[in-house]
C-alpha cells in the first residue's frame, strides 16, 4: 500500500524548521505517511485552515477559535512565551506610549494572529491596523510608514539594529496579568476528518518524535533552521529557537493548556472573538 500523503503547513522561520527537521530530511521512520512540506506565512496558513486545505498545519491560537470545527489541536508543537513574546516597537526618538496605540497606525502580521489578539487585550482595539508581512514590519516602522509595529519571529532579537525601541512586551504583560501562565502564540493542528482508526494518534506521535529528534540533535537541526533565519547568525538562531522550541513544545503541560483556554476566554469576553471557543486536543 502506498504511503498516505499528509500536507504539512508551517511558517518559513527557524523554530518551525527546527521542529520539522527530522521529517524534512527523512531522518525518522514515517509509519506509513508521506509528508509534503508547504511553507507559508502564518496569516496565509490561518486562512487556508478556514478552508480545511491542509491535513496538518501550524496556525495561530487566536485563529483556532474559528477553526475548531475543522481541526483539533495537537498536544505538542506549541510556540509559547515564558515572560517574553511578541513586542511593539517604535522609532527610537518617537514619544509613543502603549496607551496611545489604539489611535495610531500599527503594522501587524495579521488579524488572526495571536499577537494581535493579545495586543488588543493589553491596550484596547487598534483602530488602524496595517496588515504587513511579518518580515517587513521592522522596515516599515524604521521608514516611518507606520507609527509602531507588532513584531513576531526573529525580529524580537534584532529590532535595535534598525534604530527601534520596545515599548511593550506581550509576554511580560500576560505573565503579570495571569499570575504566571505562558503566552500562547502558535499551535499545530490536525484536520478532524483524519479521525479514522488510529490515524490521529499515529500522526501525533510521529510529529512529536520529529520535535524530540531536533532537540536531541540540536547542531544538525540548527544548521537546517538557520537557512530560514533571514540574516540571523548561528548564535542568534540558536537563541531564537531556544525561546520557542523546548520541553514545552513536546507537551503543553497543564498550565499551557490552561493558558490557551484563558486567552480565548478573555478574547471572547472582550468582544474580540465572536464565538465561545472550544479547545479540543488530540490525545496520543
PLM features per residue range, with description:
Residues 3-25, 39, 86-148, 153-157, ...:
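Bilobed "Venus flytrap"/periplasmic-binding protein-like clamshell domains
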Residues 6-7, 70-79, 105:
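A structural signal for short loop-to-beta-strand junctions that line the ligand-binding cleft
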Residues 15-18, 28-60:
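Extracytoplasmic small-molecule ligand-binding "clamshell" domains
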Residues 41-43, 52-65, 133-134, 151-157:
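Beta->alpha turn/N-cap motifs
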Residues 73-96, 176-193:
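Hydrophobic/proline-rich hinge and linker segments of small-molecule sensing/allosteric domains
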Residues 135-226:
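Pocket-lining segment of extracytoplasmic ligand-binding domains
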Residues 195-266:
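Secondary-structure end/capping motifs
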Residues 266-284:
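Conserved C-terminal helix/tail region of periplasmic/extracytoplasmic solute-binding proteins
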Amino acid at each position: 500500500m502506498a504511503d498516505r500523503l499528509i500536507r504539512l503547513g508551517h511558517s518559513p522561520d527557524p523554530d518551525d524548521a527546527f521542529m520539522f527537521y527530522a521529517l524534512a530530511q527523512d531522518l525518522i521512520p514515517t509509519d506509513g505517511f508521506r509528508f509534503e512540506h508547504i511553507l507559508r506565512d502564518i496569516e496565509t496558513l490561518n486562512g487556508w485552515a478556514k478552508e480545511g486545505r491542509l491535513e496538518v498545519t501550524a496556525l495561530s491560537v487566536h485563529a483556532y477559535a474559528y477553526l475548531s470545527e475543522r481541526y483539533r489541536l495537537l498536544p505538542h508543537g506549541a510556540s509559547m512565551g515564558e515572560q517574553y513574546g511578541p513586542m511593539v516597537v517604535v522609532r527610537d526618538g518617537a514619544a509613543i506610549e502603549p496607551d496611545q496605540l489604539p489611535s495610531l497606525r500599527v503594522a501587524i502580521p495579521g488579524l488572526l494572529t495571536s499577537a494581535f489578539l493579545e495586543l488588543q487585550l493589553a491596550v484596547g482595539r487598534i483602530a488602524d491596523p496595517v496588515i504587513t508581512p511579518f518580515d517587513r514590519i521592522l522596515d516599515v516602522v524604521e521608514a516611518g510608514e507606520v507609527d509602531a509595529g507588532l513584531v513576531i519571529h526573529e525580529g524580537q532579537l534584532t529590532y535595535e539594529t534598525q534604530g527601534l525601541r520596545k515599548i511593550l512586551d506581550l509576554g511580560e504583560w500576560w505573565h503579570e496579568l495571569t499570575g504566571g501562565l505562558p503566552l500562547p502564540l502558535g499551535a499545530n493542528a490536525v484536520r478532524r476528518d483524519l479521525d479514522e482508526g488510529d490515524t490521529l494518534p499515529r500522526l501525533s506521535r510521529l510529529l512529536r518524535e520529529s520535535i524530540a529528534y531536533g532537540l536531541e540533535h540540536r547542531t544538525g537541526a540548527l544548521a537546517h533552521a538557520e537557512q530560514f533565519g533571514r540574516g540571523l547568525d548561528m548564535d542568534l538562531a540558536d537563541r531564537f529557537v531556544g525561546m520557542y522550541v523546548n520541553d514545552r513544545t513536546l507537551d503543553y503541560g497543564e498550565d499551557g493548556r490552561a493558558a490557551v483556554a484563558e486567552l480565548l476566554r478573555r478574547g471572547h469576553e472582550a468582544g474580540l472573538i465572536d464565538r465561545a471557543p472550544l479547545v479540543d486536543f488530540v490525545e496520543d
